[in-house]
């Protein structure tokens, strides 16, 4: 068996980096394994920016990760590797001279690790609605509004029109003329639609809510917002969404093609897609999920349904913000450290 470490952190985003830092501050041995796959990494967008993080507002998320890893390098008991973890299991060992529960993880390169505590910071993946063109517009002409979503959106200077969170992004588009809200999937709920529309109105003169043929939802939303002069509701089906070819004389927009053949131009669209776990490691450990699909944890220390295993960040919370992810990592580090120091 390989040398036993105090804690293994799987995932190198804000949550995993925060957990590693907290454990380092208590002088524990920590290995962080990073698959280098992040929810806010979009290859087609050269100038991705993050927001809602004090001291790092409107800066690149990849630079944030580099800076955090650089800070961790001064801790002599910390190690970082860019490798995906393919399997993890719980076992026992007497290697330290006493019987203790361990977690064994195997990386894609065959390297194995044994740790007393395990922290999962493995993130989530977005599940897009079945609307033609949506994935091509995602994070290019579409914001997602939710106080429960991590930064993924792109600012105006990226010249794209599809975004993810109007707290994290949207300010750069505050002078828009018309914005569309896609009330489909998890967003097809009256109070959610109303909240999205009101927030989008902070950045646009007018809002169109697209229900994609759900006239019942449209009627419910109308009762809430129908008297607002800035809001209109479209109950036609959506055939596709797309971004027209940009020319020097044209603004960057998103086109919504409807079932009757008409097309509506929007400065950007707003939608919150569903998410699923980005890693299957939780299944190998038999961890419980919430009804929303997040790993079930006990706050404030973010321990899962299995003792000694913690889950932090997007994979374990509806609040998918960078700042809340980093904070959850710190709480899990405290919980793991207390258990290690108490000998359990």
UniProtKB/Swiss-Prot annotation:
EC number: 1.8.1.-
UniProt key word Ribosomal protein: no
Cofactor note: Binds 1 FAD per subunit.
Record's signal peptide: none
UniProt KW keywords: Disulfide bond, FAD, Flavoprotein, NADP, Oxidoreductase, Redox-active center, Virulence
Gene3D superfamilies reported in the protein's UniProt record: FAD/NAD(P)-binding domain (3.50.50.60)
Domain of life: Eukaryota
Cofactor: FAD
GO MF assignments: oxidoreductase activity
Pathway this chain belongs to: Mycotoxin biosynthesis
GO biological-process terms attached to the record: cellular response to toxic substance
Amino-acid positions noted as binding FAD in the UniProt annotation, renumbered to this chain: 12-15, 34-39, 51, 121, 314, 321-322
Major enzyme class: oxidoreductase
Disulfide links within the chain: 165-168
InterPro entries, A to Z: FAD/NAD-bd_sf, FAD/NAD-binding_dom, Ferredoxin-NADP_redctase_2
Family of this protein: Belongs to the class-II pyridine nucleotide-disulfide oxidoreductase family.
Quaternary structure and interacting proteins, as annotated: Homodimer.
Record PANTHER family: THIOREDOXIN REDUCTASE 1-RELATED-RELATED
Function as written in the Swiss-Prot or TrEMBL entry: Thioredoxin reductase; part of the gene cluster that mediates the biosynthesis of gramillins A and B, bicyclic lipopeptides that induce cell death in maize leaves but not in wheat leaves. The nonribosomal peptide synthetase GRA1 incorporates respectively a glutamic adic (Glu), a leucine (Leu), a serine (Ser), a hydroxyglutamine (HOGln), a 2-amino decanoic acid, and 2 cysteins (CysB and CysA). The biosynthesis of 2-amino decanoic acid incorporated in gramillins could be initiated by a fatty acid synthase composed of the alpha and beta subunits FGSG_00036 and FGSG_11656.
Protein name, UniProt field: Thioredoxin reductase FGSG_00043
Organism, as annotated: Gibberella zeae (strain ATCC MYA-4620 / CBS 123657 / FGSC 9075 / NRRL 31084 / PH-1)
